[in-house]
Amino acid sequence: MIQPQTHLNVADNSGARELMCIRIIGASNRRYAHIGDVIVAVIKDAVPNMPLERSEVVRAVIVRTCKELKRDNGMIIRYDDNAAVVIDQEGNPKGTRVFGAIARELRQFNFTKIVSLAPEVL
């Protein structure tokens, strides 16, 4: 469960290292975001000499959460960290690689480009 002021790791090579959620896209007063939700975030830490810089406002899609995700078949998935992938306005990832495992549910939310870049889909 991601809410405003939550810090997230960045799971791609876009140049950002850490994000802080400032808004959840989709509803005016949603409190929590889950896997597959798009958020507005600010970059808190970035790699030097990369296109994305610190204090830049970006959109990101959540790919991993510490909070459990329960599937219809009864399987429960939980990750060790909260992570997101930086995307552009069309929903395409800004980076060219995705690090770590991501959930299969992203395919249902039409983030197929992120799923194809991921090394492991759970």
Swiss-Prot record:
Primary localization class, coarse: plastid
Regions that span the bilayer: none
Keyword field contains Plastid: yes
GO CC annotations, alphabetized: chloroplast; large ribosomal subunit
Superkingdom in the source lineage: Eukaryota
PROSITE patterns in UniProt: RIBOSOMAL_L14
Compartments where found: Plastid, Chloroplast
Keywords assigned by UniProt, alphabetized: Chloroplast, Plastid, Ribonucleoprotein, Ribosomal protein, RNA-binding, rRNA-binding
GO biological process entries: translation
One Gene Ontology MF term: rRNA binding
Pfam families: Ribosomal_L14
Subunit (UniProt): Part of the 50S ribosomal subunit.
Record family assignment: Belongs to the universal ribosomal protein uL14 family.
Role description: Binds to 23S rRNA.
PANTHER family per the UniProt record, alphabetical: 50S/60S RIBOSOMAL PROTEIN L14/L23 (PTHR11761), LARGE RIBOSOMAL SUBUNIT PROTEIN UL14M (PTHR11761:SF3)
Protein name as it appears in the record: Large ribosomal subunit protein uL14c
Encoding gene per record: rpl14
